[in-house]
Amino acid sequence: MKNRISEPKFCVSIAAPNTSKLKSSINSAFLSGAHLVEIRLDSLNSFSINFIEELSNTHKNKLVLTFRSKHQGGLSNISESDRLQILNQLLDLKHSFKDIESDTFNRNSTLFKNEKNLIVSWHNFNSTPSTNSLSVLIKNISKKLSRPTQIIKIVTYANSLNDCNKVYKLYPRFKKSKFQLLAFCMGENGSISRILSPMLGAPFIYLSLIHI
């Protein structure tokens, strides 16, 4: 019998305005076959850590928690100190992944570096730097990581299909690294990279609910 190629895991990102809508969207995502759900906490008009803990315990090892900063596309107007306090509280939720922007991680690496379920993310919403530039960025982040379960996520905007090639070339460079690499491109030209990234080594891919 021939070995079947395993189906890639995919993560659905949800930016809900309130906790009621968030719960229903999470249920819809899992019913549609999602393996993971990313919760954009910055989109919620209000929430409590106890509520997020309840979700984390209900959906063990299936949630990615993130609170994007304003300059990284975040939707909340809270102060940076308040945002950092929330991120710190999320570290107590052991059954969920935490996605932290690279600049926040670099400024507070001692706080986050030992988190087992950590995703350090870097986004460029306008273009895709060279493969060498992205490699330097990844190496600098990786120096502060400490666990093989940790993930570095690189997301760039593809103005052409060649931009996707720049990202593809990252995977063989970091194949034997002490972390996992998750890299793909945004935009119409970058759509194909979401499909190909798990074949190159990404632990999972990101999709919207309408694409499931």
Which residues does each predicted region cover?
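Conserved small/polar residues in nucleotide/adenosyl-binding loops
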Residues: 210-212
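Active-site-adjacent beta->alpha loops and helix N-cap segments on the catalytic face
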Residues: 43-55, 102-113, 159-171
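Short, acidic/polar
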Residues: 17-29, 81-87, 129-142
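Alpha-helix-loop-beta-strand connector modules within alpha/beta enzyme cores
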Residues: 49-71, 171-177
